[in-house]
UniProtKB/Swiss-Prot annotation:
Catalyzes the isomerization between 2-isopropylmalate and 3-isopropylmalate, via the formation of 2-isopropylmaleate. It catalyses: (2R,3S)-3-isopropylmalate = (2S)-2-isopropylmalate. InterPro entries: 3-IsopropMal_deHydase_lsu (IPR004430), Acnase/IPM_dHydase_lsu_aba_1/3 (IPR015931), Acoase/IPM_deHydtase_lsu_aba (IPR001030), Aconitase_4Fe-4S_BS (IPR018136), Aconitase_4Fe-4S_dom (IPR036008), IPM_dehydratase_rel_enz (IPR050067), IPMI_cat (IPR033941). Heterodimer of LeuC and LeuD. HAMAP family: LeuC_type1. The lineage of its organism: Bacteria, Pseudomonadati, Pseudomonadota, Betaproteobacteria, Burkholderiales. Its cofactor is [4Fe-4S] cluster. [4Fe-4S] cluster binds at residues 351, 414, 417. It comes from Variovorax paradoxus (strain S110). This is 3-isopropylmalate dehydratase large subunit. GO terms for biological process: L-leucine biosynthetic process. The gene is leuC.
């Protein structure tokens, strides 16, 4: 029987299935950070349990870590709760162990969904979980990856398994050559704009088509990262030579005979040609334009040359109400041109867009424009996703380009993606952000978030408002 990529990985990891479809699934890799792990470790401690398989755990601190003040060490973490979570992770890993731990201030520390792939901890065919919804990022490697809750974090630590039911299969095919000036971020925002934030609910999405194959591994990670924003629990991209080339030589990747055996298996991780999907969505990549969200949901997105929608033109009452509420929160008027929206801050970073390719993309725009950050922009910050990314960017001189233009070059971490550390928006401030969520209060109470690509964010920083990066790139 022909199987999809999702079918193959699921079948390889099912330990037992009940009559109602509930299955026990074996977990290969458990990524751990400081926010959703303290209660789980405490649960193990109270029950007198140890980690079932220490070699499955890779940990780092990211959500609460500051992006400035590293010279002060742990004293640079201003918020007491944040500091306690970071130090508690240190203590828990010291007690329980891990295959790899990248603590605060270490060279390889960074966002968990950046350090996992770059360290070789994420491998094709794996089941990967983390107490974070954007674990779907790792699906770019042909791994079945999804977020879990805190109680499930403890369950995986104790048993190396999870309970769950198999999702349906969705295929999202993006065919054609992506236009100049458009990126993986524009692809995934266009997908979400088409199917909505509930379009993938109940599905695991496989992203395929020539436009997806043409993306780098970093671009594929951006797409899979936002599968959760399309409603899916997980996103997948089939393994190809790009996948294998990216992994080779990474610190935790297999070597020698084990590498050869792994590669032979990885090359089987593709959907069979005649595999059936429960739903198929198709997009023409040649028609995709730079995307900008205008509202308080990722599905509230339009092309850069578009306009803020008019609720009076929406026939569906619930959708009309959602538009009206979003307009009030975002402080926007119907029919306003997107390129007439001025901004207060710019954030280039997050697990969606903080890898070296993203840094290069943004720096290239800044260098091309040859101008400083606009006077109306209070803060433009660039936050690499890990110490490794930061070091590589500095070797290439990207930090010099950013700083010369008036951007702040920060230390790695989740930063302004979420209001859980010192980097946040004040009420009413408007931000061009390369992150993944534009919910009310996501970047700070009353903050207004517009999701864009790194290139679009860089161009907005210099011009002070949204512009079509294709005009300048």
């Amino acid at each position: 029987m022909a199987r999809t990529l999702y079918d193959k990985i699921w079948d390889e990891h099912v330990v037992h299935t009940e009559e109602d479809g509930t299955a026990i699934l074996y977990i290969d890799r458990h990524l751990v950070h400081e926010v959703t792990s303290p209660q789980a470790f405490e649960g193990l401690r109270e029950a007198g349990r140890k980690l079932w398989r220490i070699s499955s755990v890779v940990a780092t601190a990211d959500h609460n870590t500051p992006t400035t003040g590293w010279e002060r060490g742990y004293e640079g973490i201003a918020d007491p709760t944040s500091k306690e979570q970071v130090t508690t992770l240190d203590k828990n890993i010291a007690e329980f162990g891990a295959a790899a731990f990248f603590p605060f201030l270490s060279k390889r520390q960074g966002i968990v969904h950046v350090i996992g792939p770059e360290s070789g901890a994420t491998l094709p065919g794996m089941t990967v979980v983390c107490g974070d919804s954007h674990t779907s990022t790792h699906g770019a490697f042909g791994a079945l990856a999804h977020g879990i809750g805190t109680s499930e974090v403890e369950h995986v630590m104790a048993t190396q398994t999870l309970l769950g039911k198999k999702a349906k299969n969705m295929l999202v095919k993006v065919e054609g050559k992506l236009p100049f000036g458009c990126t993986a971020k524009d692809i995934v925002l266009a997908i979400i704009g088409k199917i909505g934030t509930a379009g993938g609910t109940g599905y695991t999405i496989e992203f395929a088509g020539s436009a997806i194959r043409d993306l780098s591994m970093e671009g594929r990670m951006t797409v899979c990262n936002m599968a959760i924003e399309a409603g899916a629990r997980a996103g997948l991209v089939a393994v190809d030579e790009k996948t294998i080339g990216y992994i080779k030589g990474r610190p935790l990747a297999p070597t020698g005979v084990e590498w050869d055996q792994a590669v032979a298996y990885w090359r089987t991780l593709q959907s069979d040609p005649d595999a059936a999907f429960d739903a198929v969505v198709e997009l023409d990549a040649t028609q995709i334009q730079p995307q900008v969200t205008w509202g308080t949901s990722p599905e509230m997105v339009v092309d850069i040359n578009g306009r803020v929608p008019d609720p009076d033109k929406e026939k569906d009452a619930s959708k009309r109400s959602a538009i009206e509420r979003a307009l009030v929160y975002m402080g926007l008027e119907p029919n306003k041109a997107m390129n007439d929206i001025f901004i207060d801050k710019v954030f280039i970073g997050s697990c969606t867009n903080s890898r070296i390719e993203d840094m290069r993309e943004a720096a290239a725009v800044v260098k091309k424009l040859g101008q400083k950050v606009a006077k109306n922009v209070k803060l433009a910050m660039v936050v690499p996703g890990s110490g490794v990314v930061k070091e590589q960017a500095e070797r290439e001189g990207l930090d010099v380009i950013f700083k010369a233009a008036g951007f702040e070059w920060r230390e790695p971490g989740c930063s302004m993606c979420l209001a859980m550390n010192a980097d946040r928006l004040e009420p009413g401030e408007r931000c061009a952000s390369t992150s993944n969520r534009n919910f009310e209060g996501r970047q700070g109470a009353g903050g207004r978030t517009h999701l864009v690509s790194p290139a679009m964010a860089a161009a907005a920083a210099v011009h002070g408002h949204f512009v079509d990066v294709r005009t300048f790139a």
